[in-house]
């Protein structure tokens, strides 16, 4: 039994899953005067959320200020409107990567609260928003973060013209996507501008910029593989996707972009040595792989409302995941069944039920879950042996691992 204790009363929940649900319904103000007892993983999870909610408040305030500075009133109205679309997408993220930058920064126990990490965190969140804008074009997605995507927003606006010309529909989509590319590009360079204007005099500026560029390059390399693999498998006479292929996407696109990169940026800002950063990057690699496996499991079995995107999009996009590669390598007959749905748009609920059933009965879901848990456990074990991270922040990192395991979106 896990105890949730504050000044006035005590609440008991049965397990970490219940604690996670309870925390999600609370807020940072409520959590400040509360402690959790009875289970180490629960205590670690709670420590992470207390840290995360604090950083979330700071980042939301900072991103609002940054977003307001994006608007240049001397710009053409069309540019101002486009910039407002960037701002619309740049303000409602989960800020997990920003929190990892803060965690990497504070993990040296600098005994200060000077928020030096904030411009770095907001620049990274702006980069993330920008690459997701491009990702939405690549995936032909209509929803992101529970909102319509930028191309869809423009497309809806163009529809109001009631133009009936023969090529209007095709041109409308092309222009909407083109604007999405332009706005994503704008966000990339605004993120760079934030970094340069805030850290040009920092003694670690070159290290920050080099690492930031490495993260961006790795992410784009991973995206290239992620785009080509499903197309090649679906339409070209090439060998089937293997687990090694999938792991290469996970390494470049997710492990670096979502976990290794942001935490390492915070460490550079805190002036950790290159050797210490390399050790943490090796540790965080497994965590990044586990993070993506969880994402892919949620992409099939998650709740659409919580995910903020279509629950069938991974299947419609013929996305190559560890679930898919497991069946491709182990069960040709079930792969044939899976191909009835993979790459098909507008899948019905019963279609997705059949996909879920295939992944479950073949053991693909269990296989993916077991690897994910192994990655998380390995990260925890290695973390115990790291001597240069402050113990308080080790607990928060451990809590973050538990969060990744139990998250539902």
Where are the predicted features?
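All-alpha helical catalytic cores of prenyl diphosphate-utilizing isoprenoid enzymes
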Residues: 51-58, 62-80, 88-99, 178-190, ...
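A glycine-biased, small/acidic residue-tolerant capping/turn segment at secondary-structure junctions
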Residues: 74, 297-307, 335-342, 351-353, ...
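Conserved N-terminal diphosphate/IPP-binding helix and adjacent helical/loop segment
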Residues: 8, 12, 16-124, 129, ...
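Divalent-cation-assisted or electrostatically stabilized phosphate/pyrophosphate-binding catalytic cores
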Residues: 144-184, 235-255, 279-282, 304-330, ...
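Alpha-helical phosphate/pyrophosphate-handling elements in metalloenzyme active cores
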Residues: 75-127, 244-287, 323-328, 376-409
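Short acidic/histidine-centered micro-motifs embedded in hydrophobic/aromatic stretches
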Residues: 103, 123, 140, 211-215, ...
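Helix-loop-helix
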Residues: 196, 328-334
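Short aromatic-glycine-(Arg/Gly/Cys) micro-motifs in beta-strand/loop hairpins
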Residues: 1-6
